[in-house]
């Protein structure tokens, strides 16, 4: 009976993933193009030593964002993960501009975007990618799970998606979503509905590292034993007052060497 139950859960998770994909994605999105590049890159890099870059909130400052992309490129990353708010209103014109910068500066790097609260969901689904997605590699022992919480809550379908994806274990599992959970340290512009369920799930599954964005600073915390980072300094106006962390333009470079994970915050001058 236990084996049947486990199989049933796997099937349910697979159906859920397909459902999210069919609802949230169309052909020829940035996600699809990047996934093809990533699959090729996974075969090229050494499982013993590879790097990826995380950044977020690039709206309203193309000059800084271009510097951010150029800096990220120098690390020869396996992929770049953008934490959302690539635009102010998510229009097609803004999306054209964003894609032109990405394609012009890092055309060869797989580029994945977590949906933010400034995005237009219709445009995002048609041109950027799904609202929930998972990057997975058995060869690299790597799993990156991105979940939509741009409405300041983690809804039941997203929580179910997250739990399904966490059930498939990898040596290093990362979780990303745009808005940070409310904690004693992070108590402004954060979300509460579903936050306890989120942090419990991450702790119970021994997630390697959680990435959040939205608040335009760099900050670190440990939440129920899970290392957590806010990285939202890719161009949007910095959150100078009232927030924990360092209000600087920056990227986070993640290095996985012999299965051990290290991170480095690298500043960018305006």
Model regions: which residues?
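Active-site-proximal beta-strand elements of phosphoester/diester hydrolases
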Residues: 49-59, 141-150, 174-176, 227-233
